[in-house]
């Protein structure tokens, strides 16, 4: 790497800077990697070159005949993220990162590229790193804080480390100076990123300004312990579909099916994993869904960054802690198991608590929850202070529902329903009604009340209420024992069928427009829908994707909005971290600006905007 040198001409007192590529932001970022990771400049350049080869190979297979360079330049102008809960990926470091937040070793990059080159039809089998040399052999794992980390970030990192320590057999030790051997260095870098597994010597974890959230920090530590992203597992396509037409073309390599020998360790797929992509990962507009759950009830579950899920922890415990607690005889119920850090205690699935996971989890900042024994008569359950003044931020409740012997639990949502609206639920009610109470359930938020009736697979169900950021009405549910057959899902979400890539020699040849996506909001002209078309020639002029307004019927009167409410329904899929407080007018059905209510239909006096508002990318 060439540097800037200052030459002082003493006779004229003129300072001239002779600068080369050291002023290049990419090279300045490269110095960040060299400072915080055990990596030489040549190795860093090799990893970058391998990542470019992966991108070009994946791009050529998906968009045959199109120019990768042109797409890469256009994509570099846009913001990208792997989850709306994790912040956007810093453009300076993205050339060095795989799947948005993974800094690969040279060996890992070579292995992935080889797998891609050999067989394009198979999937890289990943959940936990299979390379045994990449696991941490010596405990405690030493770590230090770089001088760039501020006090608040340090407190969040310590909290995340303690969660890992409490839930697993892994231990950590903070050291002030750089020790000999292997260690982790937390630093405030250009975004959130980490390496996969132990790589030897100094190994950085970047916790940038947009990453200071416990779930994000736990995610990056998870990578360092050996966890890949959840949707990279070999069984992922049984639970999600990848909508290629909505992915930024030069990032298609972060979704392709590949093949390698990396183990899932027998842990079930978890749509609520903190390691899972969000629904708009690498999206062309940060709104269109690129990851669609086959069961649409899970759509707003994926991408959470609140905390590790039960199965996230179980993966690490299976990899590192199998020999712990062998001599203990603690018995745990409902899918719980002995806590490796303290074998006399049970580690319980979310929503469960007690000494043996036999009861509901303790509530937080509210008097709520409990064990409810059901009969054939309906019993009602509601969130704290429902409906007025409604729930508050940072509350949690859980209810353990038990049907009569030989029967199941039936659940229906009734009356008003309203939560902070985000693409990944931050405030939500969760239903765990499958026969696996360990796995994450359906999470519901926003203000569209689920209209179907749910029936559990067994005689047990769990309801969890969680609020993190906002205040709102909440929910009311009625539940009873039933002989009905299980109803735990609805038809899969279907968006667009992708055509096989075909390239023709003629210029500017577009395929037909695909189907419209679902509207992002249900009323008031508040949402958008989109559709895409593929370029069949090497290059096309015109828009690839177009957007339109939708659901122009005015939103119904909300009888509870006479109080102060946050305008969280206009977040456009992003987390409302700041509440815009206003007194809502509640005497008539509502429309979102610039629309106004005209006889129950949202219209605008701007030309053509009352019908379809077109945008393009």
UniProtKB/Swiss-Prot annotation:
Keyword annotations of the record: Cleavage on pair of basic residues, Developmental protein, Disulfide bond, EGF-like domain, Glycoprotein, Hydrolase, Metal-binding, Metalloprotease, Protease, Secreted, Signal, Zinc, Zymogen
Gene Ontology cellular component annotations, sorted alphabetically: extracellular region
Domain Peptidase M12A as annotated: residue spans: 127-322
Annotated ranges, domain CUB: 368-482
Cofactor dependence: Zn(2+)
Sites where a glycan is attached: 174
Domain (TSP type-1): residue spans on this chain: 507-556
Active site: 220
First-tier enzyme category under EC: hydrolase
Compartments (UniProt record): Secreted
CDD domains membership: CUB, ZnMc_astacin_like
Task performed by this protein: Metalloprotease. Involved in molting, a process during larval stages in which a new cuticle is formed and the old cuticle is shed.
Protein name: Zinc metalloproteinase nas-36
Organism this protein belongs to: Caenorhabditis elegans
